[in-house]
Swiss-Prot record:
<keyword id="KW-0997">Cell inner membrane</keyword>
<dbReference type="InterPro" id="IPR003810">
    <property type="entry name" value="Mntp/YtaF"/>
</dbReference>
<feature type="transmembrane region" description="Helical">
    <location>
        <begin position="162"/>
        <end position="182"/>
    </location>
</feature>
<comment type="function">
    <text>Probably functions as a manganese efflux pump.</text>
</comment>
<dbReference type="GO" id="GO:0005886">
    <property type="term" value="C:plasma membrane"/>
</dbReference>
<keyword id="KW-1133">Transmembrane helix</keyword>
<dbReference type="InterPro" id="IPR022929">
    <property type="entry name" value="Put_MntP"/>
</dbReference>
<dbReference type="Pfam" id="PF02659">
    <property type="entry name" value="Mntp"/>
</dbReference>
<feature type="transmembrane region" description="Helical">
    <location>
        <begin position="4"/>
        <end position="24"/>
    </location>
</feature>
<feature type="transmembrane region" description="Helical">
    <location>
        <begin position="127"/>
        <end position="147"/>
    </location>
</feature>
<keyword id="KW-1003">Cell membrane</keyword>
<keyword id="KW-0813">Transport</keyword>
<keyword id="KW-0406">Ion transport</keyword>
<dbReference type="GO" id="GO:0005384">
    <property type="term" value="F:manganese ion transmembrane transporter activity"/>
</dbReference>
<comment type="similarity">
    <text>Belongs to the MntP (TC 9.B.29) family.</text>
</comment>
<keyword id="KW-0472">Membrane</keyword>
<keyword id="KW-0812">Transmembrane</keyword>
Length: 182
Protein backbone atom coordinates (compact mmCIF):
# COMPACT_ATOMS: atom_id res chain seq x y z
CA UNK A 1 0.00 0.00 0.00
CA UNK A 2 2.92 2.35 0.68
CA UNK A 3 4.17 1.78 -2.88
CA UNK A 4 0.75 2.77 -4.19
CA UNK A 5 0.64 5.98 -2.16
CA UNK A 6 4.13 6.93 -3.32
CA UNK A 7 3.17 6.13 -6.92
CA UNK A 8 0.05 8.29 -6.56
CA UNK A 9 2.07 11.23 -5.27
CA UNK A 10 4.74 10.84 -7.94
CA UNK A 11 2.20 10.64 -10.78
CA UNK A 12 0.31 13.69 -9.54
CA UNK A 13 3.32 16.02 -9.44
CA UNK A 14 3.17 17.11 -13.09
CA UNK A 15 -0.55 17.86 -12.82
CA UNK A 16 0.10 19.73 -9.57
CA UNK A 17 2.76 21.90 -11.20
CA UNK A 18 0.54 22.64 -14.22
CA UNK A 19 -2.29 23.48 -11.81
CA UNK A 20 -0.08 26.04 -10.10
CA UNK A 21 0.48 27.69 -13.47
CA UNK A 22 -3.23 27.61 -14.34
CA UNK A 23 -4.17 29.11 -11.01
CA UNK A 24 -1.61 31.87 -11.43
CA UNK A 25 -2.77 32.62 -14.96
CA UNK A 26 -6.54 32.41 -14.61
CA UNK A 27 -7.09 33.21 -10.92
CA UNK A 28 -9.81 30.59 -10.44
CA UNK A 29 -12.02 30.65 -7.36
CA UNK A 30 -12.75 27.45 -5.38
CA UNK A 31 -15.63 26.38 -7.63
CA UNK A 32 -13.78 27.11 -10.89
CA UNK A 33 -10.75 25.21 -9.60
CA UNK A 34 -12.78 22.01 -9.73
CA UNK A 35 -12.73 21.84 -13.54
CA UNK A 36 -8.97 21.43 -14.08
CA UNK A 37 -8.65 19.34 -10.91
CA UNK A 38 -11.38 16.95 -12.08
CA UNK A 39 -9.90 16.72 -15.57
CA UNK A 40 -6.40 15.95 -14.29
CA UNK A 41 -7.75 13.49 -11.72
CA UNK A 42 -9.91 11.63 -14.23
CA UNK A 43 -7.10 11.30 -16.77
CA UNK A 44 -4.58 10.23 -14.12
CA UNK A 45 -7.06 7.57 -12.99
CA UNK A 46 -7.94 6.29 -16.47
CA UNK A 47 -4.44 6.15 -17.96
CA UNK A 48 -3.00 3.55 -15.53
CA UNK A 49 -6.12 1.45 -16.05
CA UNK A 50 -5.52 1.65 -19.79
CA UNK A 51 -1.86 0.75 -19.30
CA UNK A 52 -2.80 -2.17 -17.08
CA UNK A 53 -5.20 -3.69 -19.59
CA UNK A 54 -3.47 -2.82 -22.84
CA UNK A 55 -0.18 -3.81 -21.32
CA UNK A 56 3.36 -4.15 -22.41
CA UNK A 57 2.77 -4.27 -26.19
CA UNK A 58 1.25 -0.80 -26.43
CA UNK A 59 3.69 0.66 -23.91
CA UNK A 60 6.65 -0.64 -25.93
CA UNK A 61 5.22 1.10 -28.99
CA UNK A 62 4.39 4.45 -27.40
CA UNK A 63 7.40 4.65 -25.06
CA UNK A 64 9.64 5.26 -28.07
CA UNK A 65 8.12 8.72 -28.55
CA UNK A 66 5.84 9.56 -25.60
CA UNK A 67 8.41 11.86 -24.02
CA UNK A 68 8.77 13.83 -27.28
CA UNK A 69 5.00 14.14 -27.53
CA UNK A 70 4.59 15.32 -23.93
CA UNK A 71 7.48 17.77 -24.29
CA UNK A 72 6.13 19.14 -27.58
CA UNK A 73 2.62 19.67 -26.24
CA UNK A 74 3.73 21.30 -23.00
CA UNK A 75 6.41 23.42 -24.69
CA UNK A 76 3.96 24.73 -27.31
CA UNK A 77 1.29 25.63 -24.78
CA UNK A 78 3.95 27.12 -22.49
CA UNK A 79 5.45 29.19 -25.31
CA UNK A 80 1.97 30.42 -26.25
CA UNK A 81 1.35 31.49 -22.65
CA UNK A 82 4.67 33.33 -22.49
CA UNK A 83 4.00 35.05 -25.82
CA UNK A 84 0.54 36.14 -24.69
CA UNK A 85 1.92 37.33 -21.36
CA UNK A 86 4.49 39.49 -23.10
CA UNK A 87 2.44 40.80 -26.00
CA UNK A 88 -1.16 41.23 -24.95
CA UNK A 89 -2.70 43.90 -22.81
CA UNK A 90 -4.79 42.89 -19.81
CA UNK A 91 -8.03 43.37 -21.77
CA UNK A 92 -6.93 41.18 -24.71
CA UNK A 93 -6.22 38.09 -22.65
CA UNK A 94 -8.62 35.20 -22.49
CA UNK A 95 -10.28 34.85 -19.13
CA UNK A 96 -10.85 31.13 -19.30
CA UNK A 97 -9.11 27.92 -20.18
CA UNK A 98 -10.54 26.30 -23.32
CA UNK A 99 -11.85 22.73 -23.13
CA UNK A 100 -9.40 21.74 -25.86
CA UNK A 101 -6.37 23.12 -24.03
CA UNK A 102 -7.46 21.48 -20.77
CA UNK A 103 -7.88 18.15 -22.57
CA UNK A 104 -4.42 18.42 -24.13
CA UNK A 105 -2.86 19.33 -20.77
CA UNK A 106 -4.67 16.44 -19.09
CA UNK A 107 -3.34 13.97 -21.65
CA UNK A 108 0.19 15.39 -21.60
CA UNK A 109 0.46 15.25 -17.81
CA UNK A 110 -0.93 11.71 -17.61
CA UNK A 111 1.21 9.93 -20.21
CA UNK A 112 3.53 8.64 -17.47
CA UNK A 113 0.49 7.19 -15.69
CA UNK A 114 -0.15 5.05 -18.76
CA UNK A 115 3.26 3.43 -18.37
CA UNK A 116 2.79 3.15 -14.62
CA UNK A 117 -0.34 1.10 -15.26
CA UNK A 118 1.78 -1.69 -16.68
CA UNK A 119 3.76 -1.81 -13.42
CA UNK A 120 0.58 -2.42 -11.44
CA UNK A 121 1.01 -6.06 -12.50
CA UNK A 122 4.22 -6.12 -10.46
CA UNK A 123 2.80 -4.96 -7.13
CA UNK A 124 0.05 -6.89 -5.43
CA UNK A 125 -2.77 -4.33 -5.49
CA UNK A 126 -6.31 -4.07 -6.74
CA UNK A 127 -6.03 -2.17 -10.04
CA UNK A 128 -9.37 -0.38 -9.64
CA UNK A 129 -8.56 0.72 -6.09
CA UNK A 130 -5.12 1.83 -7.30
CA UNK A 131 -6.56 3.94 -10.11
CA UNK A 132 -9.11 5.46 -7.73
CA UNK A 133 -6.36 6.44 -5.28
CA UNK A 134 -4.23 7.87 -8.10
CA UNK A 135 -7.21 9.84 -9.43
CA UNK A 136 -8.17 11.18 -5.99
CA UNK A 137 -4.58 12.14 -5.10
CA UNK A 138 -4.18 13.95 -8.41
CA UNK A 139 -7.55 15.68 -8.03
CA UNK A 140 -6.71 16.88 -4.52
CA UNK A 141 -3.21 18.10 -5.35
CA UNK A 142 -4.41 19.74 -8.58
CA UNK A 143 -7.22 21.52 -6.74
CA UNK A 144 -4.79 22.82 -4.13
CA UNK A 145 -2.30 23.71 -6.88
CA UNK A 146 -4.85 25.88 -8.69
CA UNK A 147 -5.75 27.69 -5.46
CA UNK A 148 -2.13 28.21 -4.44
CA UNK A 149 -1.29 29.30 -7.98
CA UNK A 150 -4.07 31.88 -7.80
CA UNK A 151 -2.53 33.31 -4.67
CA UNK A 152 0.89 33.50 -6.34
CA UNK A 153 -0.67 35.01 -9.47
CA UNK A 154 -2.29 37.78 -7.45
CA UNK A 155 1.17 38.76 -6.28
CA UNK A 156 2.79 38.97 -9.71
CA UNK A 157 -0.19 39.88 -11.98
CA UNK A 158 1.09 40.02 -15.58
CA UNK A 159 4.04 37.78 -14.81
CA UNK A 160 1.67 34.97 -13.81
CA UNK A 161 1.02 33.97 -17.41
CA UNK A 162 4.74 34.04 -18.17
CA UNK A 163 5.42 31.99 -15.02
CA UNK A 164 2.74 29.48 -16.05
CA UNK A 165 4.36 29.13 -19.47
CA UNK A 166 7.79 28.64 -17.95
CA UNK A 167 6.37 25.96 -15.63
CA UNK A 168 4.84 24.08 -18.57
CA UNK A 169 8.07 24.22 -20.57
CA UNK A 170 9.97 23.11 -17.46
CA UNK A 171 7.70 20.10 -16.94
CA UNK A 172 7.98 19.16 -20.60
CA UNK A 173 11.76 19.43 -20.41
CA UNK A 174 11.84 17.31 -17.25
CA UNK A 175 9.79 14.59 -18.96
CA UNK A 176 12.04 14.65 -22.01
CA UNK A 177 15.29 14.58 -20.01
CA UNK A 178 14.08 11.78 -17.72
CA UNK A 179 13.28 9.57 -20.69
CA UNK A 180 16.43 10.41 -22.63
CA UNK A 181 18.98 10.16 -19.82
CA UNK A 182 17.53 8.16 -16.94
Amino acid sequence: MIELLLLSLALSMDAFAVSLGLGARFGYNKRESLRPALSFGIFQGIMPLLGFFVGVTFIAFISAFDHYLAFGILALIGAKMIYEGLSQSEEERLDELSHRTLLILSIATSIDALAAGVSLHLIDVNVFLSCTIIAFTTFLLSYLGVLWGKRAGEQCKRGAEILGGVILIGIGSKILLEHLFF
